[in-house]
């Protein structure tokens, strides 16, 4: 290859490398976008863009409204100004200044509207560009999937299924995110509307000047945001991310402010509700006090009447008590319902606060994750820049090395051309060498095919080993899972044992408590019986009092008639006062009803607002109704229970009365004895039952304790066995890890040795550390080590993939050189034939001269003398051509030259033709050419003087030619022996190269397997330094071969 071809191939390869880098970059971006983090980022970006769009639309609408209001104000001010100018021309200057300021503000607002419209268009174009980029990436993935070989259909199907699943998951996640975003936006809008509704009544309309100031402030804030965004769009990707993060922080702060305002409003409303509840409870307490006063006993009334007290208005009001009680019960029910509603609203408020706190936490976590992602992206960008700079430096070094190698190859070519000139005389041996070389080429091609087959077999073996490794990893994972499950089971069993122990203690405590309760119940029974006896005594006393009071009423009846009229008057006065008090109470009740209605409306508004905030417009009311129904059911159940208890109490009372009647018939002594007997029997029965229950519980506890102890022993044994297994598994796993690390280290050493010392020196460091078992075993250094391994494998792939091209180039060069050698071989065979013919003719002439005499020889010599004179004249006329092309006159094309002269000049001609073909003149050859010409010219000058001397000269020349022929034959024999020796050396070198090829094929199998595991089925990403190193070694080897390789080229 020439320098131009090599430079063109280098440029082509660099372009292909750049294209592959770009494709890898875009594919990595697509994969990152299709990952979970990328999906989250896209969702967050989508949410941000939509929220920004909504904000911009709202701002745009607000600005349009403000522009309309300002235009209206302008028109009004212009009309006012005209009227003022008509009435007061001096105040026109102030109005003009105001108009100028308002015009500037209008221009500013219009500019802001235009910028907002441009921002909306830019966001739309960005969304369209993102969609087109997604489509382009999808088409690229489809093309890549279509461009893969048919052998990897199963892998392609798996990848397609994986991409489909990822797409479905992404769409589902995006739909969920959109739904959540819509829900959150609706809730935010509702909360904002509630806040505006709550704030709107308290905030009257301000003047136009204040509106103008507020608009300027808001537009300044919006302009600041847009300036942030414009600067972010102009800067790099990292700055854009930082600015977006700052914008997110600002929006987060605004949202927190809104949430704090809403929470403050809610707290104020809750305080108002609590105040209302307190007022309602106070009203209830007052009503209950009134009821307690109205429910005085009959004895108090009779006592008051007997003592001559004036009857109270409350006693006369007892006739209206049923209606008041019903109304009060209704009010109490209403108050209970309101209280339940308020409690439900409190619970809903608490749930909303919890959701807000959770959302705040999630948002802060997302912000932190975004910061971490930004930092990781910046680090990856810096690493990529460093790698790119290192690769550029390596490429420049490789280019310089290639240039130096090309210069060295040029020098070596010159040396080889000289060696080829020395080997031109070995023509017959080259036929055999040609055949041997052809056979060796065939055997080499067969060996290469065999090596390729071996490489494929090694690839299959490597795949099998990789599958076995994966199976081992899966088994390790399953063992780890079983270990985790066993640990969880052990923990569960320990918890169960503790719970069983707690239950045993609890049962013992319950047994002790039951005994205490039995004693308490017995004491309560005694107290109930004593109370019954006392009540009976009280009833007897009351009957006596009633008889006495009746007697006193009959006695005092005559005296009371006189006082009745006075009492009636007083009662009428009290009734009128009571009526006035009732009216006042009704007014108060009506006012309270109005207040309760207002509060009911507020409560309904609050319920509706809370339902809107929660998004459940129907659920809260039904839940409230369900709670009320539950309470009603509980009330009914409690009422039924009360009725049942009352019935049981009545039954008991009847039983007690019957027993009392029976006991009165018997005597006190029999009654006492029977009671004592029954008590003793009951006590004995209770003791027996308690003793039996205690025995049963004791036996059950002992059984459970023994069972638990046995279970504990079994679990401890199983736990010890599991620990032993886990320790053995951990040891095996560590041994396997050590073996793996040692194997990876040996693989790395061999791969780096194959890639060359320069490559190993530039790529051996892993975060500043040399590769070792400890470094490989560390999780932090594993990505760097795996990256270096993949780089080494890729370099070997590039080296092995370039073998075919090199072999083809060598074959082409060999065919070209073989053709040139065949041509030169044919020409030199012809020249040798001519030389043989000339020598045979010379011998025949010598024999004829000896036989026939000197007369024809003299005539021939004279003719030759004439020809030599003519040649001398020509040489004198053309000295330059004689000095450069002295051997042209002796070429076989001139038919008039004598055979003897041709024989004398044939060696010079054969020596002069080789440099003429090689197009590189040599000084030694020029001197060799000059010498025979001088040898020819000298005898020509002495020809006319002495024929006998000329004849002796010709004889000497013939002897010299014979001697030269013998020397040439001996040189040919020596050259043949040297060529054979060189061929043997070349055979040994070929064997060594075949061994290297075998090793490289094996390593290529390992590297292709790792590349397939890595997912890279396409072409190699970039030409690495390992390929160049191998080329250097190969070229050095070819230069060190010397003459053996020149023989190959000749063939």
Swiss-Prot record:
Residues 309-321, 877-897, 916-928 have a biased composition (Polar residues). Keywords: Coiled coil, Cytoplasm. InterPro entries: Cnn_1N, Mto1-like_Mto2p-bd. Pfam families: Cnn_1N, Mto2_bdg. Its main location: cytoplasm. Residues 10-200, 239-285, 325-743, 787-878, 950-1004 form a coiled coil. It comes from the Eukaryota. GO terms for cellular component: cytoplasm; microtubule organizing center. It is found in: Cytoplasm. Residues 58-100, 141-160, 294-329, 877-902, 909-928, 984-1051 are annotated as: Disordered. Residues 58-90, 294-303, 984-1001, 1028-1040 have a biased composition (Basic and acidic residues). Involved in regulation of nuclear migration. May be involved in regulating nuclear positioning. This is Anucleate primary sterigmata protein B. It comes from Emericella nidulans (strain FGSC A4 / ATCC 38163 / CBS 112.46 / NRRL 194 / M139). The lineage of its organism: Eukaryota, Fungi, Dikarya, Ascomycota, Pezizomycotina.
